């Protein structure tokens, strides 16, 4: 059995790039590839997160477990996560600077009536070797040393202390993957297939202006707009990433990406007696992605790492198939050589991944 490679060349077009968000279009692809990219981003991107909390003192109103859970979900700068070892694969006996980062959270409220403890109060442990990473020691983000933040108002809240209360904890962060626990997930990612609209021009000519306006009003997402004026080009008025205008006797598609396939417009047309007036189908070769980073890794870097991880997985799959095929063919040849002539056997399936 031969597997012929598909003659498609996927490409990526970046639509919008911000500090913590990225919108891009995956072109000339299919659902399996789009879903693979999404799953890799959610579960296969390595990052750092607080895994162990040693409570030395806690007189706040929150239980130890509540505070530990909040600390575990704090995003930590993971741009250097690839330089760390997974703790269960490290050669050390317990933990070391190659697989963990140690922090201290020691805050007391003595002077004021209350004190809000935020992630800015977390400091590197003095016993941790800072010489390995220098100023790039992974810290909870946003980092107080590189950004202009007010620690009292802009930090991520952990717990509020009243006068006389205090907390003292030792924190240990380690490397992990999103498939192990949600605290290691680096981003939320989603995609949608681009909808394709088509109108029956013959039936559209039979509609009145009020009926066309009713079609536009039936959409809860304002995908359509009725202008009452037919354009000179009845097929396309313009094309961009988020606005696509398809004219049908004054009825235009102006926000196609807002379509949620609710079929309200189609149901309205059926009430008018024209069930085939509008057809909406997803384009299974064009996918609009949105990556919302937690801040631990920039979104463009997340996509880059995801593609590298996906490529490595495909290489491993090809290598394993080739190895299994060679092992199977080798054992068959050896058996024939030892036992002499045998009756014809069915040919071994051949899988070509090149």
Regions picked out by a protein language model, each given a short descriptive name:
Residues 1-354:
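Protein-protein interaction/assembly regions in multi-subunit complexes
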């Amino acid at each position: 059995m031969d597997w012929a490679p598909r003659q498609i060349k996927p490409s990526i077009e970046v639509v919008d790039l911000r500090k913590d968000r990225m919108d891009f279009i995956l072109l000339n692809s299919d659902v399996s590839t789009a879903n693979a990219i999404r799953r890799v981003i959610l579960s296969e991107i390595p990052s750092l997160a607080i895994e162990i909390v040693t409570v030395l003192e806690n007189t706040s109103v929150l239980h130890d477990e509540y505070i530990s859970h909040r600390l575990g979900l704090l995003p930590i700068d993971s741009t250097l996560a690839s330089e760390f070892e997974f703790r269960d694969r490290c050669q050390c006996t317990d933990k070391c600077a190659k697989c963990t980062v140690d922090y201290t959270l020691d805050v007391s409220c003595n002077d004021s009536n209350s004190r809000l403890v935020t992630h800015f109060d977390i400091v590197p442990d003095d016993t941790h070797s800072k010489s390995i990473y220098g100023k790039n020691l992974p810290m909870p983000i946003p980092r107080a040393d590189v950004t202009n933040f007010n620690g009292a108002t802009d930090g991520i809240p952990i717990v509020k202390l009243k006068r006389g209360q205090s907390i003292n904890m030792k924190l240990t962060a380690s490397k992990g993957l999103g498939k192990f626990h949600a605290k290691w997930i680096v981003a939320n990612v989603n995609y949608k297939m681009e909808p394709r609209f088509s109108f029956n021009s013959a039936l559209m000519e039979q509609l009145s202006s009020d009926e066309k306006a009713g079609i536009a009003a039936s959409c809860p997402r304002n995908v359509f707009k009725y202008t009452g004026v037919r354009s000179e080009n009845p097929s396309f008025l313009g094309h961009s990433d988020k606005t696509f205008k398809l004219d049908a006797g004054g009825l235009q598609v102006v926000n196609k990406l807002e379509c949620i396939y609710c079929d309200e417009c189609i149901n309205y047309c059926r009430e008018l007696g024209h069930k085939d007036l509008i057809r909406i189908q997803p384009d299974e070769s064009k996918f609009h992605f949105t990556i919302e980073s937690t801040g631990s890794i920039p979104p463009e870097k997340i996509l880059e790492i995801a593609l590298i991880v996906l490529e490595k997985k495909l290489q491993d799959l090809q290598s394993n198939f080739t190895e299994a095929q060679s092992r199977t063919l080798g054992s068959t040849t050896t058996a024939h050589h030892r036992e002499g002539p045998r009756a014809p056997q069915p040919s071994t399936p051949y899988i070509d991944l090149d």
